[in-house]
């Protein structure tokens, strides 16, 4: 299955047969004091620095989140989107819990964006499915619903099926639904990674959709996060993840290696290009 996103002119194809597409996570105020300070001043220079560094490091799509306490994201998210799109021809992933901010950003954007995110809750489906349909956007569907997050992989897949069915019923193409099986902290739930990996395998087998996840979530609260994230990322890609949301400076080498091992990089062209560009 192929999900097509686009910037002003550039298309990015997320394909279940690979290669892996990286969604850069760094434009997010969480733990980024400088980003909060510059956004408060309506200064987008640092946003553009983060965009450029991620693209250079291997990001194909950029996640854009401007959420911090007291922010007017209905105003700031579209302004940030315009600033990025004026300088870079790259597809954007619009990241906000506020449906009005998502809609405002979609109005301001060029190309085809990815909404981050919907879930199986009725309020979420009713608020955002019409928006995705109206603006022709793809979206990420989280495997959680009104009952919360289950540890049963089969139930997570059932939630994914529900989201896809509702999207299709709303007139959205099935291929424009990317599923997030949810990666949770292994420090809090010892089987968290196994649950996520099994959910990924089931989604790939039963539904055949593209799959994303927040790659660094599993290591929260632990030392050696980079090593743990790297191990999990390789396993997740082998299980069926096609477009992780992550720091490209940390995971591009892992993703290029996994694609090569899985036979998705003929004659190691992308692998060699990446490592030669780093020297």
Where are these regions (language model features)?
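Domain-level signal for soluble alpha/beta catalytic cores
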Residues: 1-178, 184-279
């Amino acid at each position: 299955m192929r999900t097509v996103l686009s910037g002003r002119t550039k298309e990015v194809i997320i394909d279940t047969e690979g290669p892996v597409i990286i969604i850069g996570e760094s434009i997010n105020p969480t733990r980024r004091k400088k980003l909060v300070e510059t956004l408060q001043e309506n200064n987008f220079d640092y946003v553009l620095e983060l965009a450029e560094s991620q693209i250079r490091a291997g990001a194909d799509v950029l996640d854009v989140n401007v959420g911090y306490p007291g922010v007017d994201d209905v105003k700031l998210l579209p302004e940030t989107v315009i600033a990025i799109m004026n300088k870079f021809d790259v597809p954007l992933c619009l990241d906000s819990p506020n449906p009005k901010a998502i809609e405002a950003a979609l109005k301001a954007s060029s190309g085809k964006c990815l909404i981050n995110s919907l879930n199986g809750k009725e309020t979420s489906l009713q608020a955002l499915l019409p928006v995705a349909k109206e603006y022709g956007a793809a979206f990420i569907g989280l495997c959680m619903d009104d009952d919360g997050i289950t540890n049963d992989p089969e139930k997570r897949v059932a939630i994914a099926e529900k989201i896809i069915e509702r999207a299709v019923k709303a007139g959205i193409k099935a291929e424009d639904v990317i599923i997030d099986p949810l990666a949770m902290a292994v420090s809090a739930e010892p089987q968290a990674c196994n649950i996520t990996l099994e959910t990924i395998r089931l989604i790939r087998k039963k539904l055949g959709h593209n799959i994303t996840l927040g790659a660094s979530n599993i290591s929260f609260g632990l030392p050696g996060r980079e090593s743990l994230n790297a191990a999990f990322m390789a396993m997740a890609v082998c299980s069926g993840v096609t477009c992780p949301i992550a720091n490209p400076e940390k995971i591009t080498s892992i993703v290029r290696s996994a694609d090569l091992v899985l036979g998705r990089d003929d004659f190691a062209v992308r692998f060699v290009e990446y490592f030669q560009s780093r020297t």
